[in-house]
Amino acid sequence: MARTIAELPKGSRITDYISIGVISKSFPLDKVNQILQSTGKTSQRQRELPAHVVIYYVLALALFMQVSYREVLRCLLEGIDWLSAPGTRTKVTGKSGISQARTRLGSGPVKELHDAVVKPIAGRDTRGAWYRRWRLVTLDGSTMETADNHENEAAFGRPGASRGRSGYPQIRFASLVENGTHVLFGTQLAG
């Protein structure tokens, strides 16, 4: 499943739409580091892409699915450089470095971060979120196409289609959705 846009339209930057501050406020660095520690995925040495940056990178990829991996990383690092001490500059690594960093990290820390942070957020005054003292949630499910490789096909399979099999392996998921805010939580993935 290819990403179709190599970069954002001219005159716009990813940081114009969302800043590193929004991601880091929703997923605080302390919580990210705590989860990296508990999963044994902290960076053992200083790398171009430390583990906490890779976590934020994966989050940014989910937000900007049509933009190339390298462009998402460049814009993310631009935000990190802006927040860092003057004169420090983070280099955008090559494609193989990005892939190696994501492989080193694995899915465990991202799943654990999701489970720790993504929770229902409705207050008692949120319209449509409560019935008397009970929080209202809906069960929803869907599928998402994933990269066309042997590992994903073995893990998730390919659904049938009118002429054979579908073009991509698909992840099936079910999630609780908080009425009133539409926050998905308690998500479970399956093949």
Regions found by a protein language model. Give the residues of each.
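Conserved, well-structured functional cores that handle cations and Mg-NTP chemistry
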Residues: 1-191
